[in-house]
A protein has these predicted regions:
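An aromatic- and glycine-enriched ligand-binding surface/loop that stacks and positions planar moieties
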Residues: 21-76, 166, 173-175, 188-195, ...
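Bacterial N-terminal signal peptides that target proteins for export
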Residues: 1-7
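C-terminal motif of bacterial Sec signal peptides marking the signal peptidase cleavage site
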Residues: 17-19
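Short coil/linker segments at helix-helix boundaries
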Residues: 140-162, 209-223
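Conserved, well-structured interaction surfaces
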Residues: 33, 41-49, 53-57, 73-138, ...
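Short coil/turn linking the two alpha-helices of tandem helical-hairpin repeats
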Residues: 135-142, 184, 204-213, 397-400
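Long, intrinsically disordered, low-complexity segments
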Residues: 93-94, 168, 248-300, 374, ...
Length: 543
């Protein structure tokens, strides 16, 4: 059974502070004081439960990421060119950190050493997570390891260096790794969650330092490799491989798939703890999200060859470009032959719901969850696939990657969907021009491992799509110029009716001037309701 975290009234009382004059000879019984609280394992657990709600990302933070991967009607300011220096802070909030430090300040009241170390591990995991998110956004940041009062002069101290904060973050993670339980549980923190976070943190910091010309990048990349290998060798986690569409089913599941998911966010219909991913993907009012054309182009063919090496790929129609591709494409967007879970009816992409024509399906379950705020599938936050990708990328950036390393990481991801393995020698001998291009790829990648680094980035983008990674991946790779590139949708040869999924029924009509007669489900006037890159033909222009 999934645990539900409810902070009791005891906790609410425990964090209430009052001042008592000396003449009081009794502690008021309507309050609990830190000096007399935190004495039992239950009290430690109750207090630290709040960190799950306060610091774990929500579903919307994960599935609706703004980047060059998913295009929506409302662009993030970084991509629209409208970002300005704000008049006041946004995200500069330390309330959650104060709660963590307050707990750590008093947890020594508990004399049960094992219990105290476990819940100190929870607190220090979340402090590491808090600071990792802040460093990603701000760089240098003030480090606090004690709870401050509103008049404490340390509130106004200068920022600590990125180097100092990241070192402290790793110390917290190492403590969590040593003290959290080894028993798998996708809904509470374990040793394996802490190793996965260390893998993530160290990959980010190592590659950020490498591509931004900072020192010690090797230290962090080696730490990423070490944490990843420990996880891979000791945790017992593997990839979810059940059924004919395991990648799709991994995310379209009420409960987290414990084979692969290390930790995730719990949603529960019976408690009205819900999110909105399915309405986001299947309505006209949630930004009409769709995958960007260049990301679709980056999916390989099913035999491992490059789609962008095919003659005429630029002007292929939707049904043509979807043929014989990496199976993860058809498990992430609607492609010809798509059916909803629980239905046998074939459904085409709906351009009323997606502005690019690449209609998202990741996280979507049966159609009854399409209504607003009805989704209750749990959201994976840490999964084994990410650790594999972190491991391979860190070794490639260090120059220590071997084919054997690929075989125990990237190969496993491709095996799940029936794809051929990545050949390191071939990748480095023939780097992909599409991924080298400033318009569609990563021109900053150089050196002997250029080809395999590009292929690992391709794999990461595809495997972790809509999981909240893309924006900061681009930032750490120093490829922010990607946000200046065009955001495009499917190719439309010209006015006319189109059977997008080739089921024998027309799905959309693109027209110029007077709307034609007929019974097509959707009519779009070129130049008014939709813009194409060549006027009356071309790619859908989204912004």
């Amino acid at each position: 059974m999934k645990p539900v975290y409810i902070v009791s009234w005891l906790f609410a009382l425990a964090v209430s502070f009052v001042s008592c004059d000396d003449w009081l000879d009794k502690t008021p019984k309507d309050r609990l004081y830190p000096d007399v609280y935190f004495k039992t394992e239950d009290e430690l657990r109750l207090f630290t439960n709040q960190f799950y709600n306060n610091l774990v990302p929500s579903a919307v933070d994960i599935y609706s990421e703004s980047s060059d991967l998913i295009v929506k009607s409302d662009l993030m300011l970084e991509m629209s060119g409208q970002r300005i220096i704000p008049d006041e802070g946004n995200g500069w909030n330390f309330t959650a950190l104060r709660d963590i430090n307050f707990y750590l300040q008093y947890s020594h009241n508990c004399t049960e050493v094992n219990a105290r170390n476990r819940y100190d591990g929870v607190a220090r995991f979340f402090r590491a997570y808090f600071y990792f998110e802040k460093v990603k956004r701000y760089g240098d940041i003030p480090w606090y390891d004690k709870a401050l009062d509103s008049d404490d002069p340390e509130l106004y101290k200068a920022r600590d260096s990125r180097e100092f904060v990241m070192q402290k973050t790793l110390e917290d993670l190492d403590f969590a790794i040593a003290n959290l339980p080894k028993t798998k549980n996708a809904y509470v923190l374990t040793r394996w969650t802490a190793l996965a976070l260390k893998s993530r943190v160290c990959l980010f910091e190592g590659t950020f330092r490498k591509y931004h010309g900072l020192e010690d990048y090797e230290k962090y990349l080696n730490a990423c490799v070490s944490a990843s290998e420990t996880f891979m060798n000791e945790s017992g986690y593997t990839l979810y491989k059940s059924g004919s569409t395991p990648y799709r089913d991994l995310f379209a599941s009420i409960n987290l798939q414990a084979d692969e998911v290390i930790f995730g966010r719990d949603y529960e219909a019976s408690l009205s703890v819900l999110h909105n991913v399915q309405n986001y993907e299947n309505s006209t009012t949630m930004g009409r999200p769709g995958m960007n054309k260049k990301i679709v182009n980056s999916y390989l063919m099913a035999d491992g060859s490059r789609f962008t090496d095919k003659a005429g790929y630029e002007t292929m129609t939707f049904d043509q470009e979807c043929q014989n591709r990496d199976p993860r494409l058809a498990q992430t967007i609607r492609t010809p032959g798509y059916t909803r879970i629980g239905s046998t009816k074939k459904e085409a992409p709906n351009l009323a719901y997606t502005m690019t024509g690449y209609h998202l399906i990741k996280y979507s379950m049966t159609a009854n969850y399409d209504e607003y705020n009805k989704s209750c599938n749990d959201i994976p936050l840490f999964r084994t696939a990410e650790v594999y990708l972190n491991f391979a990328e860190a070794k490639a950036e260090l120059g220590t990657l071997k084919q054997a390393d690929i075989n125990k990481s990237i190969k496993l991801l491709r095996d799940r969907v029936g794809m051929t393995n990545l050949d390191m020698e071939l990748a480095n001998s023939k780097p992909d021009p599409y991924l080298m291009s400033a318009a569609t790829g990563y021109p900053n990648v150089k050196g002997a491992n250029q080809g395999v680094i590009l292929e690992i980035r391709r794999e990461r983008t595809i495997e972790l799509a809509m999981e909240g990674f893309r924006y900061y991946d681009i930032m750490r790779w120093k490829e922010g110029k990607l946000f200046e590139n065009d955001l495009l949708g499917i190719y439309v040869p010209g006015p006319g009716t189109y059977d997008l999924d080739k089921d024998g029924t027309d799905d959309v009509c693109f027209y110029v001037g007077t709307k034609p007669a007929g019974n097509v489900p959707l009519y779009l006037e070129i130049g008014e309701q939709i813009r194409l890159s060549n006027g009356e033909s071309g790619y859908i222009i989204c912004h």
